[in-house]
Amino acid sequence: MSAKDERARDILRGFKLNWMNLRDAETGKILWQGTEDLSVPGVEHEARVPKKILKCKAVSRELNFSSAEQMEKFRLEQKVYFKGQCLEEWFFEFGFVIPNSTNTWQSLIEAAPESQMMPASVLTGNVIIETKFFDDDLLVSTSKVRLFYV
């Protein structure tokens, strides 16, 4: 195992996504929240989110995570897949993570134009969000969450 692989393994072993919520960015109202560690690789996670989230112009995502390891430049790359085809790609950067710390990270996700939105009935169960967790250029983990609109 290379030093990079070992480092990625150490970061992943000491990393936990404690909770996450999604809010309507305009009103601040929580639309969905969960405590499952959606960062765990190797399994397809599921999230049931309300259909009305698709009507929001922007969604505020709040993540609370703990890390045993220091990270120089913690960041996420996310791809939204519909039936296997990538529709959107997002990039988020948190930056420096203190070792043995718990952090809350808020990000704004702007919606696609309304003309490009598909109805919840078409999207439900067919959307997968793939999240890659990085420390700078070191890939730490890849996780997948299948969305169901309820």
Curated annotation (Swiss-Prot):
This is Retinal rod rhodopsin-sensitive cGMP 3',5'-cyclic phosphodiesterase subunit delta. The lineage of its organism: Eukaryota, Metazoa, Chordata, Craniata, Vertebrata. Interacts with the prenylated catalytic subunits of PDE6, an oligomer composed of two catalytic chains (PDE6A and PDE6B) and two inhibitory chains (gamma); has no effect on enzyme activity but promotes the release of the prenylated enzyme from cell membrane. Interacts with prenylated GRK1 and GRK7. Interacts with prenylated INPP5E. Interacts with prenylated Ras family members, including HRAS, KRAS, NRAS, RAP2A, RAP2C and RHEB. Interacts with RAB13 (prenylated form); dissociates RAB13 from membranes. Residues 144-150 are annotated as: Required for association with membranes. Its main location: cytoplasm. GO terms for cellular component: cell projection; cytoplasmic vesicle; cytoplasmic vesicle membrane; cytoskeleton; cytosol. Transmembrane segments: none annotated. GO terms for biological process: phototransduction; visual perception. SUPFAM superfamilies: E set domains (SSF81296). It comes from Mus musculus (Mouse).
